[in-house]
């Protein structure tokens, strides 16, 4: 009987320990689950507030992007635009939270429908990409001109190439511009065409002079007729520095 009682006591102790451990595990599990629920609810509350704020941000950023265009047609860029403005707006647009993953949640846990916000963000990204591409092309074109155009909407006699203008550079820009089909691309193409005419004229004169001169001696190509022809062509070169260089070679 004593042995039997001793066994029963041990069994009771073991069962008690198991019960205590089980209770502790259950409490821990419930605590972890409760904490997880609380954290998720905090994320949901944060998402609800943020989503409403993001909608206001999108409206504000859209207005800021519109200011980088000359007018409401969103075609030509404003004259005072700077690269830093584009980068700052692009950064702010990329920071917009418009996906469930931005809040560490699944779509079904979002308190509000943000599908429209996602679409609006993509519209902003497309607009800033348009602005950035146009700005880059205009800057590259400007680097090949003596003076930046006062008006990108139409060419004028003020369009004068510098030494950076080459057939290759102009062709590369042309290939970038033709991807657009707009008033802006038509205008930029007109600039490129005028610049291309000037580059080809300069190349024609330079190549002609090269044929007439071999070191310090004249070649058989150096006739009075070819000299007069190239001299007349030189007068058509708009860039005074380039024109002077060609004239000195003909002297």
Residue ranges, per PLM feature:
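Amphipathic alpha-helical assembly segments used for oligomerization, scaffolding, or translocation
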Residues: 2-251
């Amino acid at each position: 009987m004593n042995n039997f009682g001793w066994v029963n006591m041990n069994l009771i102790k073991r069962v008690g320990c198991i019960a205590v451990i089980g209770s502790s595990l259950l409490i821990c599990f419930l605590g972890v689950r409760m904490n997880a629920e609380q954290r998720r609810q905090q994320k949901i509350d944060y998402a609800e507030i943020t989503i409403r704020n993001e909608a206001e941000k999108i409206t504000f950023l859209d207005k800021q992007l519109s200011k980088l265009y000359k007018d409401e047609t969103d075609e030509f860029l404003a004259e005072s635009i700077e690269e830093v403005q584009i980068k700052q707006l692009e950064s702010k647009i990329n920071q917009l939270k418009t996906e469930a993953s931005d809040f560490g949640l699944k779509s079904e846990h979002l308190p509000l429908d943000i599908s429209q916000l996602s679409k609006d963000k993509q519209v902003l990204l497309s607009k800033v990409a348009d602005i950035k591409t146009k700005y880059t092309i205009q800057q590259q074109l400007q680097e090949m001109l003596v003076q930046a155009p006062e008006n990108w909407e139409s060419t004028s006699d003020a369009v004068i190439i510098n030494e950076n203008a080459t057939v290759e550079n102009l062709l590369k820009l042309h290939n970038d511009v033709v991807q657009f089909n707009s008033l802006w691309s038509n205008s930029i193409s007109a600039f490129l065409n005028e610049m291309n005419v000037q580059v080809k004229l300069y190349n024609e004169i330079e190549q002609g002079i090269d044929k007439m001169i071999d070191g310090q001696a004249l070649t058989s190509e150096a006739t009075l007729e070819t000299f007069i022809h190239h001299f007349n062509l030189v007068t058509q070169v708009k860039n005074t520095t380039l024109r002077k260089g060609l004239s000195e070679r003909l002297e």
